[in-house]
Design a protein with these regions (language model features):
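ABC transporter nucleotide-binding domains
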Residues: 1-145, 151
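Short, flexible helix/strand-to-coil boundary loops that buttress conserved ligand/catalytic motifs
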Residues: 11, 162, 244
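Alpha-helix N-cap/helix-start and coil->helix boundary motif
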Residues: 8, 31, 131, 156, ...
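Small/polar loops that bind or transfer phosphate-bearing groups
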Residues: 16, 126, 171, 228-232
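Generic structural marker for isolated residues within well-ordered, non-membrane alpha-helices
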Residues: 34, 52, 155, 180, ...
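C-terminal coupling/interaction segments
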Residues: 207-247
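ABC transporter nucleotide-binding domain
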Residues: 112-204
């Protein structure tokens, strides 16, 4: 369904799709091909040309207009295909690995444009294996493994559900071994790292039943100077790996 209606041929003008495998005609010129693809989406020639010049100016690629596609690098061609995907202001956008082939600068440029389209009301389906992109762009996720859906929901809710009440703490101490033993007598310490140069003891500490973050912080403050204290929240990559292992 699109807008509550079964998909019909006229709905194509409301959908933008950027496939992982790009499909530009290599012998055509950039401007010629962009105009052709825009008109396939229902745009008039004049409106397509106006919007194309807007996007080409925005991306500073106006000098590509008369180049042939086979003269462009993979990243350059991908930027053209992104433009023609969003040109007709679709309600639904489907991006399949949109950052493939981009250097970090252009990847950030496209990421910012995707976020802007989201903020302007477009619905975006984003397919990727890059979990850092999921963190940056997605509100809701579906994890698929071996063609089966294994997890679905709001990303923030899922991250809260997967957290383990573990805190990373940094302490200033000249007696790291003694302090570590003192903490271990009351809390579960999973990892420890001591830097003698600045007397910095870093610990990952998990809370037990009926123990609170305030209990831990008060205990640590009584023992040493606390340099930092933060809860460890699993990222999308951690959740993906753990979910696959559990399944």
């Amino acid at each position: 369904l699109l807008d509550g209606e079964p998909l019909q041929p006229h709905h194509v003008q409301y959908i933008g799709y950027l496939p992982e495998e790009r499909g530009l005609y290599k012998s055509m010129k950039v401007g010629e091909q962009a105009l052709y693809l825009a008109q396939l989406k229902g745009m008039s020639y004049s409106e397509a040309k106006k919007r194309l010049h807007y996007w080409f100016d925005k991306f500073e690629i106006g000098h590509w207009w008369d180049k042939k596609i086979d003269e462009l690098s993979k990243g350059m061609a991908q930027k053209i295909q992104f433009v023609v995907t969003v040109l007709h202001q679709p309600k639904l956008l489907i991006f399949d690995e949109p950052f493939s082939g981009f250097d970090p600068i252009n990847a950030n440029l496209i990421k910012d444009e995707i976020l802007q389209l989201r903020d302007e009301g477009s619905t975006i389906i984003f397919s990727t294996h890059r979990m850092e992109s999921v963190e940056e762009l997605c509100d809701d996720i579906v994890l698929i493994h071996e063609s089966k859906k294994i997890l679905e929901g709001n990303l923030d809710d899922i991250k809260r559900a997967y957290k383990t009440n573990t805190f990373e703490v940094g302490l200033m101490t000249e007696r790291s071994a003694v302090l570590k033993q003192t903490i271990e007598a009351k809390f579960k310490v999973s990892t420890a790292n001591f830097k003698s140069l600045n007397n910095d003891l870093k610990l990952n500490i998990s809370l037990g039943t009926n123990q609170t973050p305030n209990d831990l912080l008060a205990f640590l403050t009584a023992q040493s100077q606390v340099l930092h204290f933060k809860e460890l929240i699993p990222n999308a990559s951690d959740i993906f790996i753990q979910t696959i292992k559990n399944n």
